[in-house]
Structures are given as C-alpha cells and as structure tokens.
C-alpha cells in the first residue's frame, strides 16, 4: 500500500472539502483607505489563493491606513477576538517612513517565522532587484499564523503560491 502523497511536494493538492479556514486579508495603504484609489492587492490575495489550490476560506476583509497603533490593534483583534486561522497583510513593508507593517506585526507576534519573508525576498529579487528592500516577516500569535505579503498585486501572485505548502504545515501545527 502506498502512503498518501506528501502535500509539501504537491502544493496544488487540496484538503477534504469540509476544511474551511478563517482568513483575514488586511490591506495597509494610506491612499486606498482614503479612497484615492481602489485596493487591488486584497482581492488579488483571494484570487491567487483560490487559483493555486488554497483551502476553502471564510474571508475577513480589512483596509486600513499605515498607522502602527491601528495595525497592531487590528492584528490583535483578528487573532484573539475573531480567531482567524491565517492573517495575510499586504503593503507597508518597504523602507518608507510610514511603512510600519513589520514593526506592528512583530509587536503582536509570540513567535517569529522569518523564513516566509526570506523566501519572498529571494523569489522577488530574481525578477525585481529592489525587492531586497522588503522587510516582510511572519509568525504566530496563539493559533493564528500571520504573514506580511508584498503590496503589489503582481508580487502577491509570484510569492503566495510558493508559501502555500509551508502555510498548510504551519496551520497543521497550530491546530494541534
């Protein structure tokens, strides 16, 4: 009898249909939150998730400005009160003074998982040398996995599929 396929080697394998994750996608943008332009990064997270075999999800959608205190409060609420399995942020990871997503994320994490940010930088750097400026990170708070994704929709499409096997594995560990 053959063992079941290893999902980490087959990222497009889907879990049983009864598996539903509660996922928050948090767009961090002063201009999008002020209505200057439409948020394209948040919807791109959902599109890429579905296209690349992400589990069935109940989505919590958040769009806020680059304000560290508000970001921290939002991340705590999503983890502690709303009990999201996964929180994916987009935006605010660059070197600009108002890019405070990594600092806000680290302030709420119990444990940092730096490999997520490292692989996104390596993957993106191959196409866009300025990707090295990203300060994205990831980690856990309680049973929630938090990941800072890039702010550009194209970069989300390049990075999120690479992370799916590790996301699944981390969520398995967090769920016990």
Q: PLM ranges: what are they?
A:
Residues 1-176:
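Non-catalytic beta/alpha edge segments that cap or flank active sites
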């Amino acid at each position: 009898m053959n063992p079941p396929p290893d999902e980490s080697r087959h990222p497009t394998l889907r879990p049983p249909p009864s598996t539903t994750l509660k996922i928050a996608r948090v767009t961090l943008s002063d201009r999008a939150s002020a209505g200057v332009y439409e948020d394209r990064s948040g919807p791109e997270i959902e599109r890429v998730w579905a296209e690349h075999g992400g589990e069935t999800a109940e989505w919590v959608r958040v769009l806020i400005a680059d304000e560290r205190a508000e970001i921290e409060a939002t991340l705590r609420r999503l983890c502690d009160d709303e009990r999201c399995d996964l929180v994916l942020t987009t935006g605010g990871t660059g070197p600009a003074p108002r890019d405070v997503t990594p600092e806000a994320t680290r302030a709420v994490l119990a444990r940092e998982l730096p490999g997520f940010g490292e692989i996104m930088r390596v993957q993106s750097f191959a196409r866009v040398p300025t990707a090295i400026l990203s300060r994205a990170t990831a980690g856990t708070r309680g049973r929630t996995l938090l990941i800072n994704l890039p702010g550009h929709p194209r970069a989300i499409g390049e990075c999120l599929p690479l992370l799916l096997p590790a996301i699944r594995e981390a969520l398995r560990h967090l769920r016990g």
